[in-house]
Every structure is written in structure tokens, then in C-alpha cells.
Amino acid sequence: IINNGGGFYRTEFYIHEARMQGGEIEGPCINNSVAETTLYGKTIYLGFSLIKDLQASTIQKILEERKARGAFTSFHDFSSRLSIGLDDVNRLIRIRAFRDIEYSKTELLWQAQRIDQATKHRDDQHQQRMFQTPIQQVNLVELPSLPVEDAFDAMELLGFPLINPFELIANPTKAGLLAKDLPNHIGKVVSVYGYLVTIKNTSTIHRDRMLFGTFLDREGYFIDTTHFPEITKRYPVIGRGIYHLTGKVAEE
């Protein structure tokens, strides 16, 4: 389902379900990923094809070069072996595809820009490889990226974060019940916090709009909700995010 672009739910939630079943999710990796998402034992490597706007030709070059000459040992090694546009290199850096072999994202983005500028000044525009002329190595000041920066880059490039979305709240809260608590509160009004999975629009016999929602609690378990017309008007669901939900617990 992941390699087919998802199904009823977005790709994010099939990956989430794999994690809940014990899978260890790894973002795209320059030495371990292929075009499609792949399972190695319990580890799931997301495929390069999930990266927004990454060119198919770039994916093909990476896989062919890796097959022909083995794994990449450093960013400089990668740069010297492949001819890839700066935009695609930056996408790979921002998704942390080089995390097993090299510097932080900030340092690599600087290196990529420097190499690209050096390449543009070369006289021979028809050479097969971008970086055959050695680029002088420099000692870089360590500039570690923050997990929240990685998460927002993943949201832009993959369409979803690779961490629990509740970790992205400015003021994280442990208030509210969890899905596992709800059976003990049948008939009571409770509050929960939920990350929106999907929302279904429908109408009453009087043509008033109402909603059926599905959310994840902070532990990753599903909560189903019904939003009656008056509540739908007063508290519209406006898009992806984490919602504070208050309502009466009902048992199906």
C-alpha cells in the first residue's frame, strides 16, 4: 500500500501502523534505500520515491552507481561519483539521507553549495562527472540540526513527520484521556487530544452538515468521533493538526 501511494488513508498512517506493529521506520537513506519502501527484517527503509520533487533520474543514478561501485563512504565520495543537480542534493540532505556517513544537515548544505559553485566555474561543460576535480576539504564548525527542524523538513518533503506529531506542539500536554481509557468512561463527558487522521463529511435528513472523524491519541491509538451539525458549525475541522476534543463517550 505504501508503494502504491496509500489507500483510504494517507501514506503516513500506513507507516504509522507498521511502527505500531513493531516496525522500525527509517527515512530515506543514501546507502540502504531504493526507489520503493523496503523491509529488511523489522526495519523499514522509506523509498526515495516518497521524497517530493526528487527526480526519477536522480534515483536511478544513485542506485546504478551504488550497484556498480558500492556504498558511498562520505558526502565527498558521493559528490565525486555522481552528477546530480543542487536542488536534488539539497532534498537528500534535508531528509537526512546522509545521516549514517556525514555531517549535520547545515554543514552538508554548505558543502553542497560550495561544490556546486566550484563546478560552475569549470571550463569543460561536457564532462561526465560533476566533481572529478578534487575539492579542497575544510574543517567545519559543528552545527547540529534540531529534531524539530528535521520534522518540519520531513513534513515538507515526505508529507508527514517521522516523529510523534505530539512532539511538535509548542507546549506539549499530557492532559486528556487516551484511547485505552475511554471504555472506563462510557456515558461521561471527557476531553482527549487527537491528531487528525481523516474526516468524512455527511448530511442529516435535514441536509445539515455533520462529520465523522478519526484521530490518533498521543500513544498512537485510534479514536473515532462524531461531530453533530451544531458542533460542526461552531468548531470546524480546518485541516491537519492536533485537536482538543470534548464529548460524551459512546459504545458501539
Stretch-by-stretch model annotation:
Residues 1-252:
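Noncatalytic, beta-rich nucleic-acid-contacting surfaces in large DNA/RNA-processing enzymes
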